[in-house]
Amino acid sequence: DHVIDLYQLIISSWHSYRIKPWTIYGPKGTKKFVKNIMNAWKDERTQRINYEARSSTQAFKIIIKEFKSKGNIRIKDLKITYFEVDHKPVKHAFGFNFLHKNKKLTVSGDTRPCENIMKYGQNADVLLHEVFIDGELKQTNKMRSRRTLHNVRSYHTPSSLLGKIAKLTNCKKLVLTHLVPTKFNEKKLKKTIRDDFGKNPIIGYDLLKIKI
């Protein structure tokens, strides 16, 4: 879910002189998924390697570590806790906690409201959470039927509930991501969430930096 840029990340790192393998963590099925992506671009990649004559191809060596339903990963002084969230019918949907020097970032991933967000997001310095913005998508006769709108909303977190979730986690900051739709009434969205959370959320955007 939302990993279409993975191959571009790998090959761009090679273009940027990466000379060591990648380690990729993911749920069951990650090995097969990455293998299929690498195979899909094998001919194009081989041509680049042969013609560009770079000194290393280590960036194309991928170490896959598949994990279970919950657990921890440590990378130097960064501890990452992963836990299942509810994005059914999508299987193997995960949220993450990133802990560093007593600071905590909780990332919801794609999910409808679920207990694990409340459990693992407790007292987060930043809760980065997806949102489906109620009332912004209108029904059409073709690509956006009533059923479509219902089903899309049903496996995401509606804006009408997100403020309550943030309040229950007691997070210090709430940052919104995965904004559906991308065009919306920002003032109205902030008010909807603020009414329950007690604070204004931060509307996320690409390359946004937040001090934790």
Which role does the model predict for each range below?
Residues D1-T106, C114-I117, K187-K211:
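Binuclear metal-dependent hydrolase catalytic cores
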Residues G95, N102-K104, P113-L208:
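Cap/insert and terminal regions of metallo-dependent hydrolase folds
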Residues D110:
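Active-site glycine-centered loops adjacent to acidic/histidine catalytic or metal-binding residues
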